[in-house]
Amino acid sequence: MFYAPYFARNSNHAQKIANELLYDELNAAVKKRYSGLRYLSVARAGPWKLFTKEKLDSFDDLKGMKIRAPSIEGVIAGLEQVGAKPTVIPFNELYGALQQGVVDGMATLGNLMISQKFYEVTKYCYQNDWGIGLDKQMMNVGAWNSLSKEQQSIVVDTFNELEPQDFFRATEDAEKTNFAKWRELNGADTTPMLDASAAQRTLEPAIKKLADDIFGAGTYDKIQSI
């Protein structure tokens, strides 16, 4: 759900949702799915972006396009809601799928644009955020339970103190550098900023349903209020 486009306003909002509003719910969800792990916090990995081979003039142009998605419910639901055809492709097969024309574009973490050489197999990367990347920090539950309450607090608090400077700032700096490099390689007009207002209105019902189905009725409204 956290990767769904326009679920959160930005990375700071997404972190607040995960570490405050839904912290207990996320702990319960992790415990249910991964009984050996304890959820601690999130690190902001930066926004996801859309990449396409052909230029979009608006998000309406996504209708009918085959867009790569990971096996993440929020990403798939968002693409379906705007009329795209999400195609689940593992990350290690993504470059080849784009190269061979299996898909028309992709959604993935923006800061991978240069390191993974996606400029070679797509032309356009849009500056609009298309979901927020959050790296979940977890710990072996046995190791966690062996710590005192004070030690547990120190572990979480230390991570949260270091994350803004040692992790998130680096992702913000990298985004500016990466977009500049993309334009250098693919052309000055290859990182458009689209008007997202219509897409946000289209996406809202799907994102609201997803949030309320997973975390209970009224969750989406609470998220928008913080």
Ranges and model annotations:
Residues 9-31:
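A gly/proline- and charged-residue-enriched helix-loop-helix capping module
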Residues 1-13, 32-226:
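N-terminal secretory/targeting leader peptides
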